[in-house]
Amino acid sequence: MLKPLGDRVVIEAISKDETTASGIVLPDSAKEKPQEGRVIAVGSGRVADNGERIALEVKEGDKVIFSKYAGTEVKVDNNEYLVLRESDILAIIG
């Protein structure tokens, strides 16, 4: 399993349907890059100027929306993940 460092978060993207409402199957080239995912792991937090560690606001299991082109894609044990900074996360979905 991945253990992110600092203020980084590991996300598993949630893919949208591959077919439109009218039944057209979308090729990979026409699909939007996912912007929604589930938090798999979180780092220990960022270090403030005074040396204190500030905990992250997101936690494992949170469903989040993130910036479209944020982070680095990694593949571990045939699973694809996205490693990004907490600041690239736009919102937690209730």
Swiss-Prot record:
Annotated compartments: Cytoplasm
Establish whether keyword Lipid metabolism is in the entry. no
Q: Tell me, in one coarse class, where this protein mainly resides.
A: cytoplasm
Per the UniProt entry, what is one GO biological process? chaperone cofactor-dependent protein refolding
Record-level Gene Ontology MF annotations: ATP binding; metal ion binding; protein folding chaperone; protein-folding chaperone binding; unfolded protein binding
Q: Which family does it belong to?
A: Belongs to the GroES chaperonin family.
What is the role of the protein in this entry?
A: Together with the chaperonin GroEL, plays an essential role in assisting protein folding. The GroEL-GroES system forms a nano-cage that allows encapsulation of the non-native substrate proteins and provides a physical environment optimized to promote and accelerate protein folding. GroES binds to the apical surface of the GroEL ring, thereby capping the opening of the GroEL channel.
Protein name as it appears in the record: Co-chaperonin GroES
Which species expresses this protein natively?
Brevibacillus brevis (strain 47 / JCM 6285 / NBRC 100599)
Q: What lineage does the source organism belong to?
A: Bacteria, Bacillati, Bacillota, Bacilli, Bacillales
Q: Which gene encodes it?
A: groES
